[in-house]
Structures are given as C-alpha cells and as structure tokens.
C-alpha cells in the first residue's frame, strides 16, 4: 500500500513518484490550494493538492482534499518536489508531495482530542489508541522498544540464555499481595501470578544453565503511584558461581553500554558505592539522589545538654537520632511554607519539625533557640555549616523514622530550591540489613526477600545477631530511583531453613510453601546470585518522564483500572460456577 514512510521522504526522492499512507494530521484549504500534513510513525510530510483549470480529475482530487478531517486515514500517490518555503522543524521539511491520487481508507469520527493536544490523564487512558498517536508518546514508546532490543542484543552476545518461566505458579509470600487465579480442574485451589521469577531462576541455576535472563512480566496487587503498576516488566538475570562484584561489574558495564546506545548518555566510568548505613546516615534514603548537594548532619552530641526534651530524649536513646538539614537560601521561606515542610515530614512519620532561620543580616528566628546557651547554639550552627540566608531543619526520634522524613525533606528542598544538578548520578547501595522488625506483626521480615544470603556463613552467628545482620543484597540507583535490585542467594538448604525460621516461617509452613526449593537446594545447588532491573522505570528515565505510565502502552490508573477496556469488570455467574467461585455481595 505504500512505497515510502512519510517522515522519510527527502531531497533524494525529488522527481520520483511515491505512494504514502497515514493519518491526516492537519488539512488546510486555502481556496486555490490544499495542504495536507500526512503523518505516520516516522513523521510528517506535506502533501499539496493544486487544481488545474479545466481538468475534471484535478478538480475531483481537490474536492476530496477539501473534505478531509483530523485523523482520516489516507493513501496518497504523488510526485516529490522541492518546497519553496522550507520547514526546518520536519525531517521532510525541504520537500513536498504533489498529489495525483488520494484514497480515503477510513474516515475518523469527531475526536475527543487532537494528536497535538495533551488532555487529562483519564481521557488519555480511555482513548489510549489516540493518545499513543501523539508524537511525544510515539517517541517514548520507541525509547522503550530500543531499550529492550539493546538489552537482548547485549546479553545474547554474551552467552546468556533467554528462558521463559511460568505465569501460572504457586502462591508464595514475597512481600506484596498475590493475584490469584482459580484452578477449574482443582476446585478450591488457586494459581498465583508471579511477583517475580525469583524461585524459578534459582532452580535454573541448580539445573546447570549458568547464565539466565528473561524480559519478564510480573504482577503485584499493591497500591499504585506514578512509579508503580499492578503488572510491570523487568529484566531478570541470574548467574551461577559468582560473588557480588561479579554480578555488579557485569551489569554496570551493561547499563553503561545501554544508556550510550539508546539515549547517547555517557554514565560514569565507575559507579560510586556506599553501604546502606552510609546512605541512610548521609541522605536519609536507601536510593539517594546524588545530584542534590544536601546532606543530613547528625547533631545528637551537640544537643544532649540542651533543655529541649524532644532532642535530649532522642540524643540519649541508643536507637534514636537527631539530624539536621541545612538549606542554602532557605531563610526566604515564610511561616506558611515552613508549615508545609512540617506537613510533608509528617507524612513520613514526623511528629514535629524544629528549625533555625538565619536572615541575610544574621538575625535568628527559631522556636528552639531558647533551649540552648549562647555558646552551644553557636556551636550547633557551626557544626551544620549554617550561614546568613539559610534555614536548618531538625528531626528527632527513632533512627529509621528520622532518616525517612528528613530524607523526604531533602528531596522536597532539592526540587523547590532548584538544587538538583543536571546529568546522571548512578551508584551502588550495598550491605543492606538482612531483616527489619515489624512492630505490628512482632517478628522479623526480610528487607529484600527471604532468599537473600546473609553476609555470615555461620547459622549460629546469624541467629545470635539477627537484629544487626547484614545481607549480601545490593541495589543500583540512578538519580534517586532504584532501577535494579539483587543479591547473592542462599544456596544451602540448612541456611535457607534457618532464615525461614527467623522470619517466623516454621518447618511445616516452609515445607508446604517452599518444599520444591528446599528439595532443589539439597541436590547440589551452586553458589549463585542475580539482579532484576525495572524496564518501565529505566525507560521512563531515558524518555524524561516522571510517570512510568507514559512508557507502558496500556497502563492502569492509580485506581487500578483499565479505562479503555473497562477492566476489571463483573463476571457472569456461569463462568464463576465453572471455576468454583462464589462472590459475596458488597457490604453496604
């Protein structure tokens, strides 16, 4: 139906006859001439219709051109010629196509929005097929496509084996809630959609495949936000006979090469590294954005002798923290704006937010100054590096909570005070805690997942020091986004059973849920490790968008709905009966 793509018509084709197909982006009838911007996935070319006096065929052609509306689907035949007025905004802007034939392949109904408009997100998702026609959306989807293609080429060239793992699998506790699928042939029993291929890729290592990868679809029934979807795509990788640096060095080289190939970005020749403890201490986050030149400063030793009980209680608590965040130029904040910072901190667990504000002339404004002697107050300001025109926020309380809300303030200040440097800031975060204590459940939970190996090989040591145990987990972070997470796995069945026990999973429950894994580990499992990268998140970073929904062709809303297909939707009673499911009436 076509000989060339619209966006690729150029000067080399001048004088030649071409056949094009695409959508009417714009049609302009100027009386004596019609101009049609014809669009396909490669771009736009101008089609010109010039009636010839006394020529019935050209008059009919002009009539067809004058009748065109937005997004009508056309096939156009014509001759390429040089344009009198060059359009530098188009790749085809030096030429035009003089139409000799126009066929309307399909008329478009009146549009809810035009391809060059950007309506609200609900409208975009309801008419996703129209939204995806927009040049910006085409660009972002192409970025994702190029990313996946480049990853496959890179790994295929290095003898990684692309192996599919099941979509219908066993429900196992991996952190988030499972999506369940009733098993028609086994009444009362269910499959689960995989949250990740974690256990299957480990079993592939036991099976001797050595180097595995998969562009895997994953499913987690959890609350949605700009960087999270119910179903998502990850590059899943696993290596046999490796230590942490073997995995890290390989994938660091891979990510560096992929960014260069896909978006022509040169990432650092060597990614910086820091432990989880250092990241939390300096930045209040296990995925710090190093483009923001602000750091938290511990001030517990300087406030122990103050008369401010909130500070002294935390400073004298072994599990407490008093941290300061200096914001250059922050003295410009009004009282209302300071309250907004306090409210933001409260979302992350802060019960209050103290501050010291220094005017450009050095005048102090602070609700806590009265609790310090003149000497100790001056020492505090010196320690945090405060100067005229700055504001210093203080957080006090439990170490983790203070780190969390002060880290959130750091990000907010970085954005609002334009303190985020241009460029790309990758890093490795390593040595994560093995466990964290869940107050509500009154037990340990795995910080990464239950299959991450501890840094110690001795089970007695792990049991005795579970609270402070360090794992062999690692994350790759880019501009404040965790783009990849992995670990060295447990390959000994006795260690895996011990970790289950520490997580409150008894031997009987472990056998019921993970018996297949424990059995596999008993038959000569090699040391192994791996990592998974979020394709959606990396594509969003490459495309320059904050929402992964922009790089997913058919995403869900934050309300977990597909507005285009109207999913989820009710199921007929006979279909439910076939899978032995009865739906309880909604509670009014």
Swiss-Prot record:
Belongs to the class-II aminoacyl-tRNA synthetase family. Type 1 subfamily. This is Aspartate--tRNA ligase. L-aspartate binds at residues 174, 220, 448, 489. The gene is aspS. It catalyses: tRNA(Asp) + L-aspartate + ATP = L-aspartyl-tRNA(Asp) + AMP + diphosphate. Catalyzes the attachment of L-aspartate to tRNA(Asp) in a two-step reaction: L-aspartate is first activated by ATP to form Asp-AMP and then transferred to the acceptor end of tRNA(Asp). Residues 198-201 are annotated as: Aspartate. Signal peptide: none annotated. The keyword Protein biosynthesis applies. Keywords: Aminoacyl-tRNA synthetase, ATP-binding, Cytoplasm, Ligase, Nucleotide-binding, Protein biosynthesis. It comes from Xanthomonas axonopodis pv. citri (strain 306). InterPro entries: Aa-tRNA-synt_II, aa-tRNA-synth_II, aa-tRNA-synth_II/BPL/LPL, Asp-tRNA-ligase_1, Asp-tRNA-ligase_1_N, Asp/Asn-tRNA-synth_IIb, AspRS_core, GAD-like_sf. One of its GO terms (biological process) is aspartyl-tRNA aminoacylation.
């Amino acid at each position: 139906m076509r000989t060339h793509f619209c966006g690729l018509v150029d000067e080399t084709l001048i004088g030649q006859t071409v056949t094009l197909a695409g959508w009417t982006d714009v049609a302009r009838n100027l009386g004596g001439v019609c101009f049609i911007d014809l669009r396909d996935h490669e771009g736009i070319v101008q089609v010109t219709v010039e009636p010839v006096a006394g020529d019935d065929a050209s008059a009919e052609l002009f009539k067809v051109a004058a009748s065109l509306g937005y997004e009508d689907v056309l096939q156009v035949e014509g001759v390429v010629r040089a344009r009198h007025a060059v359009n530098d905004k188009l790749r085809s802007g030096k030429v035009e196509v003089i139409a000799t034939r126009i066929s309307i392949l399909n008329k478009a109904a009146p549009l809810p929005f035009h391809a060059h408009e950007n309506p609200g997100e609900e409208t975009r998702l309801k008419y996703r097929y129209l939204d995806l026609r927009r040049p910006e959306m085409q660009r972002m989807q192409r970025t994702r496509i190029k990313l996946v293609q480049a990853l496959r080429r890179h790994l295929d060239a290095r003898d990684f084996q692309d192996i599919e793992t099941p979509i219908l699998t066993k429900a196992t506790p991996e952190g988030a809630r499972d999506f369940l699928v009733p098993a028609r042939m086994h009444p009362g029993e269910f499959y689960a959609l995989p949250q990740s291929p974690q256990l299957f890729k480990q079993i592939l290592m036991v099976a001797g495949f050595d180097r595995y990868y998969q562009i895997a679809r994953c499913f987690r029934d959890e609350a949605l936000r700009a960087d999270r979807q119910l179903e998502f795509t990850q590059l899943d990788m696993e290596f046999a006979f490796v230590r942490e640096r073997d995995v890290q060095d390989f994938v660091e080289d891979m990510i560096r090469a992929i960014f260069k190939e896909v978006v022509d970005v040169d990432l650092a020749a060597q990614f910086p590294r820091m432990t989880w403890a250092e990241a939390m201490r300096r930045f209040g986050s296990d995925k710090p954005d190093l483009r923001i030149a602000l750091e938290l400063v511990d001030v517990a030793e300087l406030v122990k002798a103050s008369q401010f009980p909130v500070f002294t209680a935390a400073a004298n608590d072994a599990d407490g923290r008093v941290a300061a965040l200096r914001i250059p130029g922050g003295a410009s904040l009004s009282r209302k704006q300071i309250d907004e910072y306090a409210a933001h901190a409260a979302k992350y667990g802060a019960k209050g937010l103290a501050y010291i504000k220094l005017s450009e002339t050095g005048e102090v404004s602070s609700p806590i100054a009265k609790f310090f002697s003149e000497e100790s107050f001056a020492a505090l300001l010196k320690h945090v590096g405060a100067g005229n025109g700055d504001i210093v926020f203080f957080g006090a309380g439990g170490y983790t909570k203070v780190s969390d809300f002060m880290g959130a303030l750091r990000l907010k200040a970085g954005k609002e005070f334009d303190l985020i440097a241009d460029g790309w800031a990758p890093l490795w975060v390593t040595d994560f805690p093995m466990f964290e204590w869940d107050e509500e459940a009154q037990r340990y939970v795995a910080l990464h997942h239950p299959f991450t190996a501890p840094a110690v090989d001795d089970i007695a040591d792990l049991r005795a020091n579970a609270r402070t145990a360090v794992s062999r987990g690692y994350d790759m972070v880019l501009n404040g986004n965790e783009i990849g997470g992995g670990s060295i796995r447990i390959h000994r069945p006795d260690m895996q059973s011990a970790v289950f026990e520490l997580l409150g999973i008894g031997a009987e429950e472990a056998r019921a849920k993970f018996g297949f894994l424990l059995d596999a580990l008993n038959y000569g499992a090699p040391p192994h490790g791996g990592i998974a990268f979020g394709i959606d998140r990396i594509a969003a970073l490459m495309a320059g968008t904050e929402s992964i929904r922009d790089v997913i062709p058919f995403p869900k809303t934050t309300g977990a709905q597909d507005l285009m297909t109207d999913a989820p939707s009710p199921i007929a009673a006979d279909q439910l009966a076939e899978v032995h499911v009865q739906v309880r009436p909604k509670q009014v």
